């Protein structure tokens, strides 16, 4: 059983969760530049209806990636279910680059065999799917138009999860980058205090808002969830005891461990890349400073020493430095401290303010909140040349979190007077909003790869 399967299975047993999405992605910009692709409805070889449509989930995943535009099934010249049934000349008019075909066959009580094949439509049009190549001195079918072909057996509850797996395969084969459709997001939901005894809720859900699960509810604020690098724990800040404290919660056992209870500020916990340390902000010595705590021993090391406020730490991918926000230059800007030498250098200079910096997994860019002419927007800075690109046009943006493949950013913003989550691609072309059905949503955190 995979790590993600174990976590999801445990949560479904011990917690009351909604299988429907209380967050639903609404795409607002970016489809025109996406690549056309065909996700043919999978053939159902059983009685009644398929437990869940794999093709619909895959189409939704690829559409929300901002890189693909699945064509409507009514625009398909047919609905083949394997590569042998494809009429490449008929498909040429659709302009698609790739075609996904597949089938689902019941194999016993709650067991279903899924077959799928990803076909290079352009190569198939050239060869007709009948390319030949020399192998061992003989001409054989090369199948060089087949990009991937797999089969597996799943349960009825595993349809949606396996559809995300198919999406990952398609995405990686066509972009060369790992897909992030099997990931999850954590966030805080705030409901009306007058009508809810526990208005603050810490929630995790699939990346697309489905399978929402409440981990914790509280009468007092919850904030700043942060995933461990193995995806099994969350660190967060709670005011349950009328003061800020940092906890780590295990997603297998749901057990909670209090990490800090210092006087003053205890905030902004974030796991190191190896999961052994936790960076945080503490004001126990009088001024908000950056600290690093060893998770096992709780031993603390103070990192910054400055009269200005230092906050919002994040780790560089190699774990050797921290990025943080500081007012030491007058207005909040982003700095970098080397943990071996304690040398600090300023990273951002453009704009009135820059806050909440996080470096992309490849180390090439930094995502942050940029304030220019009084507007707070999500921006990305090229760390080689220092150029900053403003990515969003939304209002009062905050708390950006990057997908583990570096392709997308989730953040909190104000829309029609409510805090909602939004998505923007790293190049700024694709934009979407995740409006909540109830309450305000903030402090998003994207999980690492869970498999």
Swiss-Prot record:
Cell division keyword on record: yes
GO cellular component terms, A-Z: periplasmic space
Signal sequence range: 1-23
Gene3D superfamilies in the record: TolB, C-terminal domain, TolB, N-terminal domain
Compartments where found: Periplasm
InterPro entries attached to this UniProt entry: 6-blade_b-propeller_TolB-like, PD40, Tol-Pal_TolB, TolB_N
Superkingdom field: Bacteria
GO biological process, one term: cell division
Keywords, alphabetical: Cell cycle, Cell division, Periplasm, Signal
Pfam families: PD40, TolB_N
Keyword hit for Signal: yes
Listed NCBIfam families: propeller_TolB
Family: Belongs to the TolB family.
Quaternary state and interactors: The Tol-Pal system is composed of five core proteins: the inner membrane proteins TolA, TolQ and TolR, the periplasmic protein TolB and the outer membrane protein Pal. They form a network linking the inner and outer membranes and the peptidoglycan layer.
The protein's role, per its UniProt record: Part of the Tol-Pal system, which plays a role in outer membrane invagination during cell division and is important for maintaining outer membrane integrity.
Protein name according to UniProt: Tol-Pal system protein TolB
The species this protein was found in: Pseudoalteromonas atlantica (strain T6c / ATCC BAA-1087)
GN (gene name): tolB
């Amino acid at each position: 059983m995979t790590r993600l399967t174990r976590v999801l299975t445990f949560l479904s047993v011990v917690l009351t969760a909604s299988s429907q999405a209380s967050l639903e992605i609404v795409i607002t910009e970016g489809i025109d530049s996406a690549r056309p692709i065909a996700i043919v409805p999978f053939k159902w070889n059983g009685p009644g209806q398929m437990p869940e449509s794999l093709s619909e989930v895959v189409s939704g995943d690829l559409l929300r990636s901002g890189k693909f535009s699945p064509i409507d099934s009514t625009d398909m010249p047919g609905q083949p279910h394997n590569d042998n049934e494809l009429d490449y000349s008929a498909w040429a008019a659709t302009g698609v680059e790739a075609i996904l075909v597949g089938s689902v066959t019941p194999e016993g009580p709650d067991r279903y065999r899924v077959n799928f094949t990803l076909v290079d439509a352009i190569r198939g049009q050239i060869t007709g799917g009948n390319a030949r190549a020399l192998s061992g001195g003989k001409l054989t079918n090369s199948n060089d138009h087949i990009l991937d072909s797999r089969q597996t057996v799943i349960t009825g509850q595993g349809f949606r999860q396996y559809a995300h797996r198919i999406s990952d395969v398609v995405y990686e084969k066509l972009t060369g980058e790992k897909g992030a459709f099997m990931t999850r997001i954590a966030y805080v939901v705030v409901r009306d205090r007058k009508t809810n005894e526990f208005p603050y809720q810490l929630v995790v859900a699939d990346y697309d808002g489905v399978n929402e699960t409440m981990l914790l509810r509280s009468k007092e604020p919850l904030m700043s969830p942060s995933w461990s690098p193995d995806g099994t724990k969350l660190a967060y800040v709670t005011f349950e005891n009328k003061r800020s404290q940092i906890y780590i919660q295990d997603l297998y056992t749901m057990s909670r461990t209090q990490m800090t209870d210092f006087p003053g500020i205890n905030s902004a916990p974030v796991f190191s890349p190896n999961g052994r340390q936790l960076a945080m902000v503490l004001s126990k010595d009088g001024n908000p400073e950056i600290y690093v705590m060893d998770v096992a021993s709780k031993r603390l090391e103070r990192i910054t020493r400055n009269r200005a406020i230092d906050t919002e730490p994040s780790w560089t991918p190699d774990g050797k430095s921290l990025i943080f926000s500081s007012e030491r230059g007058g207005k909040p800007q982003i700095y970098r401290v080397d943990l071996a030498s304690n040398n600090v250098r300023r990273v951002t200079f453009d704009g009135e303010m820059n806050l909440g910096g996080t470096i992309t997994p490849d180390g090439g860019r930094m995502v942050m909140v940029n304030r220019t002419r009084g507007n707070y927007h999500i921006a990305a800075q090229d760390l080689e040349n220092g150029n900053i690109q403003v990515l969003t046009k939304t209002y009062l943006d905050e708390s950006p979190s990057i997908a583990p493949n570096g392709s997308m950013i989730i953040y909190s913003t104000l829309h029609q007077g409510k805090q909602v989550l939004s998505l923007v691609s790293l190049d700024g072309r694709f934009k979407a909003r995740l409006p909540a059905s109830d309450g305000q949503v903030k402090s998003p955190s994207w999980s690492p790869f869970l498999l």
